[in-house]
Every structure is written in structure tokens, then in C-alpha cells.
């Protein structure tokens, strides 16, 4: 029975290739859609494979620039670390992928969108909540979750439908990567006591193999946007890719994390985020120089909520819109240059300057050039401590009265 068109989030792997056949057999015309957010895959080969295994159309969308400008940048400016450790690699790309799938579905008049997420991960939530936030009436198909196939059953179905089955040894890991980093799980990593083996890493060098000489770089920010690396102006996605290689060489950005998944279980993940680690540290350093105290102390509260919204698949929500408006306001003064040393896994911000700097050497110095009015301190201290002083006096008087 004809069911119309379905847009499939297609990766080129066995899972989503099998999905093409399954959806086709169910009566759909399948449009395979691969969104490039910086994975480094052979996109032309993926496009051709989609057609070969039965899609009526196979589309590849280069979304690296949009990913950097519209998704990575707010996460950078909002210092988005889930559980104060994970800079949201996979979670950050999902809303953009959802947005592109919806755009393709509307353009082609599709009646459904399909993905290949398992029933115990976070991505099923991110995809489906995101899709319905943009198109509430859209039908969603998820054969991988709904069929509960074993690997053997999946391979058998692939053979029956003429889908090429990988003959090489399957990697024990489940890997997802983009501009902002690389996420790795499964295999030996499922035992949180076991150290991640060398083959679990790809973007970073082991500390014992890193150079014995540091690299010192300068990152320029314009309204919170990193615009230059060592004086060279670059589009954000290119700056990230260039910095990723440089920082990875020094073993920067390895994160071994047991995190709380949205679906209620704990999961051990190994992340590599060289560029993200450096940029987040440098951006925070520039904010420390340019943000007034109350703003500096309040912003982390918003940052925590931002990271939770991204992780939990609520990018397309009123609260996210409000948080992004807040972040935009905070970035107006985040202008200047941060000097950073990269060495043996460490990111050391060792210099910073800004036309919006709130640091006054004349007020901070302990030399004869000091302009701080120390005589004002006594009155300030008296008024600042007055509430606690009054409280103590009342408590003492009550104790005397009760004797």
C-alpha cells in the first residue's frame, strides 16, 4: 500500500541502510538525507549508497557553517557543559539535523520522518521532540527501536534485500562526531572500571606522546564570537577545525564521563573535544575580564539550564529562545584577545586584553600608584556587616533574657 514519502536521517551505515529497505517494503518512497555537521565522512559515497539500497532520492546537505554559527556558538557563549563535564557534542547537532529533515520533508511533501535511534538512548527523544516542536502533525517512524532486531537478524534482512553487509570486523564502539567533538561508547567502555584503550581515541594524542614544547596561541573575540586565530580571520567552522588539530596534538580535550541519560540510566562515554575545550576556556577568561560581578555570578545559573535543555532535546522551546536572548545581551562586551598556552593536556590562559576590560590596574595595585580609597573601606564594612551584627546582638540579648 502506498504510504507517500518518508525522509530518513541517513548515515550510510548498516542500520539506516536496512531502514531504507524496511520503509520501502512498508510502502514508502524513501528520501535518504545525510546532514554534514563535520563528521569527515565520504559524503558522495553515502549519497550513492542511499540510492543503491533503494531510496528514490538521496540528499547530502553541507550544514557545517550553520552548525557552527547557530548551534555551536550559543553553546560556547553559554559555556554549555552537561553535568559540568560534557560539552554536548552529539546533543548539539541533533536540533540542526531535525531542522534540516523537516525542511526536506516540507519541500518534498513527505508524510513522515524516520530515524534510526535505539529505544534506550537520548537521541530518540531529541529527534521526536524536536520534530513535533516544528511540525506537530508529522508521523515518525523508528524501525530500529520498534523491531528490536538483533545484529544477526539485521544482517539476514539486509542480505534478503540486497543490501551490502560489511565483511570487515565490526568496531566494538558506537561513535558519533561533528565539528565540536567526538563521542564514543560501547565495547569495553561499558565497564566504567576499565581504562579506555588507545583505539577508543582518534582526535587526541596520548599525554605521554604529546610534544615537550608548548604552543602559545591568541584567540580574538568580537561580541563573544571567536573570529581570529593568531591574527588570522577565519569562518567559525574553519577556526574550530584548525584549532581542533592543534589542541588534539597536545592531548587536550579527553573526557571520560559517567553521565545521567534522560531515559533514566547511567552511561559511560568517552569524548574528545580539543577545540571546544580551548575555546570554552578562552571565552570564559574573556568574560571574566569584561563582565560586571553580578552578571558574572548569575550567568552560570543560566548556563546550567542551557546545557540541560540541549541535552534533553528541548532546543525548540520558549525557554531556549529566552536564554538565547539573554546570552546575546551578555556578549556585547566580550571583545578582545586571549593568549593561551597548550601543553600536555592543559589549556592555560596566560594573558588577556580588551577595550571593555573592567580591570583597573590603578585600583588593583599595591604600589604607590594605588588609587583605591582605603578610607572608604571602614564605612563599607560596617554597613555590609550590619544585618549579621544586629542578628548577633538580638540572639545574645535573648540568651541573657532566658537565663
Swiss-Prot record:
Show the InterPro entries listed in the entry: Arginosuc_syn_C, Arginosuc_syn_N, Arginosuc_synth, Arginosuc_synth_CS, Arginosuc_synth_type_1_subfam, AS_cat/multimer_dom_body, Rossmann-like_a/b/a_fold
GO terms, molecular function: argininosuccinate synthase activity; ATP binding
Name the positions where L-aspartate binds. 118, 122-123
Q: What class of enzyme is it?
A: ligase
Superkingdom, taxonomy of origin? Bacteria
Instruction: Give its E.C. classification number.
Output: 6.3.4.5
- List of residues binding ATP: 9-17, 116
Residues the entry annotates as binding L-citrulline: 86, 122, 126, 174, 259, 271
Keyword list, A-Z = Amino-acid biosynthesis, Arginine biosynthesis, ATP-binding, Cytoplasm, Ligase, Nucleotide-binding
One record GO biological process:
urea cycle
Q: Where in the cell is it found?
A: Cytoplasm
Report the principal subcellular site: cytoplasm
GO CC annotations? cytoplasm
Q: Which reaction does it catalyse?
A: L-citrulline + L-aspartate + ATP = 2-(N(omega)-L-arginino)succinate + AMP + diphosphate + H(+)
Q: What pathway is it annotated to?
A: Amino-acid biosynthesis; L-arginine biosynthesis; L-arginine from L-ornithine and carbamoyl phosphate: step 2/3
Question: PANTHER family this protein is in?
Answer: ARGININOSUCCINATE SYNTHASE
Q: Which family does it belong to?
A: Belongs to the argininosuccinate synthase family. Type 1 subfamily.
Q: How does it assemble?
A: Homotetramer.
Q: What is this protein called?
A: Argininosuccinate synthase
Organism for this UniProt entry:
Ligilactobacillus salivarius (strain UCC118)
Record gene name: argG
Amino acid at each position: 500500500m502506498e504510504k507517500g514519502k518518508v525522509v530518513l536521517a541517513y548515515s550510510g551505515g548498516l542500520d539506516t541502510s536496512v531502514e531504507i529497505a524496511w520503509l520501502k517494503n512498508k510502502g514508502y518512497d524513501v528520501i535518504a538525507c545525510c546532514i554534514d555537521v563535520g563528521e569527515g565522512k565520504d559524503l558522495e559515497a553515502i549519497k550513492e549508497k542511499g540510492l543503491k539500497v533503494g531510496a528514490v532520492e538521496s540528499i547530502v546537505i553541507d550544514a557545517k557553517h550553520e552548525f557552527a554559527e547557530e548551534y555551536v556558538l550559543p553553546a560556547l557563549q553559554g559555556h554549555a557543559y552537561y553535568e559540568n563535564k560534557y560539552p554536548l557534542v552529539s546533543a548539539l547537532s541533533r536540533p540542526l539535523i531535525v531542522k534540516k529533515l523537516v525542511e526536506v520533508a516540507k519541500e518534498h511533501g513527505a508524510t513522515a520522518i524516520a530515524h534510526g535511534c535505539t529505544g534506550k538512548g537520548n537521541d530518540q527523544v531529541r529527534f521526536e521532540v524536536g520534530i513535533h516542536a516544528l511540525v506537530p502533525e508529522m508521523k515518525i517512524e523508528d524501525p530500529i527501536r520498534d523491531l528490536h532486531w538483533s545484529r544477526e537478524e539485521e544482517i539476514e534482512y539486509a542480505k534478503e534485500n540486497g543490501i551490502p553487509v560489511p565483511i570487515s570486523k565490526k568496531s566494538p564502539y558506537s561513535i558519533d562526531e561533528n565539528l565540536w567533538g567526538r563521542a564514543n561508547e560501547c565495547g569495553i567502555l561499558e565497564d566504567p572500571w576499565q581504562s579506555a584503550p588507545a583505539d577508543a581515541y582518534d582526535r587526541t594524542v596520548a599525554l605521554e606522546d604529546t610534544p615537550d614544547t608548548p604552543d602559545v596561541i591568541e584567540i580574538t573575540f568580537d561580541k563573544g564570537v571567536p573570529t581570529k586565530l593568531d591574527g588570522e580571520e577565519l569562518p567559525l567552522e574553519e577556526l574550530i577545525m584548525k584549532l581542533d588539530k592543534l589542541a588534539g596534538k597536545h592531548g587536550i580535550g579527553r573526557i571520560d564521563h559517567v553521565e545521567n541519560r534522560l531515559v533514566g540510566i547511567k552511561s559511560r562515554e568517552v569524548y574528545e573535544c580539543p577545540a571546544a575545550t580551548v575555546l570554552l576556556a578562552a571565552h570564559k577568561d574573556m568574560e571574566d575580564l569584561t563582565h560586571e560581578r553580578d552578571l558574572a555570578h548569575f550567568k552560570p545559573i543560566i548556563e546550567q539550564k542551557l546545557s540541560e535543555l540541549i541535552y534533553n532535546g528541548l532546543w525548540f522551546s520558549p525557554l531556549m529562545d529566552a536564554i538565547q536572548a539573554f546570552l546575546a545581551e551578555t556578549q556585547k562586551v566580550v571583545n578582545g584577545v586571549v593568549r593561551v598556552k597548550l601543553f600536555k593536556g592543559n589549556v592555560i590562559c596566560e594573558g588577556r586584553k580588551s577595550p571593555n576590560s573592567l580591570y583597573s590596574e590603578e585600583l588593583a595595585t599595591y604600589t604607590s600608584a594605588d588609587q583605591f580609597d582605603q578610607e572608604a573601606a571602614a564605612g563599607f564594612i560596617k554597613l555590609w556587616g550590619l544585618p549579621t551584627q544586629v542578628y548577633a546582638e538580638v540572639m545574645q540579648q535573648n540568651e541573657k533574657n532566658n537565663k
